[in-house]
Amino acid sequence: MLSRSKPNEAYRQASFDARLLGSSREDLVIFCLEDFIENLGRLEMADSRFDAAGRSQAITRCVTALTALELGIDRTAELGASLAHLYGSAKGVLLNSIRQTDVPAITAIKDDFNEIAAAFRGAMHR
């Protein structure tokens, strides 16, 4: 399947698969956050280039990452409901950006998720 892909896409997929193998639950959360943030950047870039296919691909990957994060929420944890709301709200902004990207909202989401990822990384190293 990778042979049919563009070389950069094949590399991205191989890197994605390699990071998933043997990852702990905590590593997977960080991985999903990083993938989400990276694809928000791709969305911003595709939007600035008027690349509809790139926008669509980035939105799809962002929604997939958010869905994975949502599925991993411990609903009984203190922050469970807040995380579910945050992920759902971000997903709503992305889905509303299918026709026209709300760049300021996407930038704010990216900044928020960079802070969240940093907090998760910090908690892992305690």
Tell where the protein language model's regions lie, with residue ranges.
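N-terminal intrinsically disordered, cationic/polar leader segments
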Residues: 1-40, 47-48, 53-58, 64-72, ...
